[in-house]
């Protein structure tokens, strides 16, 4: 899970960060909420996680989904269509929090938007300008990802869109384990390096064509097959306004779990008004997904991850066991993997 970077933009005052989302997908309903307390220290913030709160997502029928604290985030996952917590179209949802110190926080209810399917997405070879340790700039090979999508629903209603990209790649290790032998791992990692991407319709634009979502440097991750999964979220106008402000302030990529680079007003407040500074946003979305493959040939046949280019590699590394390459490494081949 992403960490909070509070060094971006202006330091925030002491307060609380409550950020998260509810995703009503085709297979599962997922909820995640970050809850942290901020302390000013000189010219920066020091976040402290709040780990023993009661966190619930509530729908407009009064049904509640309780979130449990795991690995830094309050989380819950239930099967889609679970009658104990309905996620029907046009229902509204908000988060309610009660800390161990009896501090209560609540978000403004958000109506669940309809799914908005992208028209298509592409991957194109290009270059990316990077800065080395000496401060000199040079161009390196990269893949640029672009998406096309409507910005209005079929009935003409405006749609506001947010994207999250996740990179998937294949890697073969050089294991000498006589039990497992050489393994092929499938690994995913959050796409790094671009700002928050949110788009809404203008008076004369109802379709977005070849909109750039960012560039990814070509490395060994493209040597055996690579997919970029694009999660498109149709969000409310209010959520769009919030993330649009965050995007204009942030100098690097922010995830939904990162505080804005300044005091951007979100939709969460202290229930009794005792805490003035509450930062973050809780939004709801019904996501759609599109995966963009890149073959090794399309990426220029980059060098594979193994063997490591060092004389003294650590005793256990991605080449002795590809499962240690990431917390998300798996030997299970995704059903959609075609390489």
Label every model-predicted segment.
Residues 1-339:
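A sequence/structural signal for flexible, mid-protein segments enriched
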């Amino acid at each position: 899970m992403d960490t909070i970077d509070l060094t971006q933009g202006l330091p925030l005052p002491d307060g609380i960060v409550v950020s998260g989302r509810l995703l009503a997908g085709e297979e599962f309903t997922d909820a995640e909420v970050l809850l942290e307390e901020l302390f000013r220290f000189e010219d920066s913030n020091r976040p402290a996680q709040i780990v023993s709160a009661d966190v619930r997502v509530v729908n407009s029928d009064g049904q509640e989904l309780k979130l449990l604290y795991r690995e830094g985030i309050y989380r819950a996952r239930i099967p889609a269509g679970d009658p104990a917590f309905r996620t029907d179209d046009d229902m509204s949802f908000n988060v309610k929090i009660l800390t161990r110190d009896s501090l209560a926080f609540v978000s403004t209810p958000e109506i669940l938007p309809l799914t908005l399917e992208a028209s298509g997405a592409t991957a194109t070879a290009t270059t990316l300008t990077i800065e080395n340790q000496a401060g000199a700039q040079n161009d390196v090979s990269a893949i640029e990802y672009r998406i096309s999508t409507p910005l209005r629903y079929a009935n003409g209603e405006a749609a506001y869109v947010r994207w999250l990209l996740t990179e998937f790649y294949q890697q073969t290790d050089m294991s000498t384990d006589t039990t497992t032998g050489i393994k092929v791992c499938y690994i995913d990692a959050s796409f790094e390096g671009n700002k928050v991407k949110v788009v809404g319709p203008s008076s004369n634009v109802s379709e977005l064509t070849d909109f750039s979502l960012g560039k990814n440097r070509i490395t060994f991750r493209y040597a055996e097959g690579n997919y970029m999964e694009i999660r498109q979220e149709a969000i409310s106008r209010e959520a769009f306004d919030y993330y649009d402000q965050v995007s204009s302030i942030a100098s690097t990529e922010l995830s939904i779990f990162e505080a804005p680079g300044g005091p951007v007003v979100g939709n969460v407040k202290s229930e009794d008004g005792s805490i003035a500074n509450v930062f973050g946003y809780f939004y709801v979305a019904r996501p759609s997904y599109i995966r963009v493959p890149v073959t090794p040939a399309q990426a220029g046949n980059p060098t594979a991850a193994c063997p490591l280019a060092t004389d003294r590699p650590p005793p256990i590394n991605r080449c002795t066991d590809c499962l240690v390459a990431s917390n998300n490494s798996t030997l299970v081949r995704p059903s959609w993997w075609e390489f």
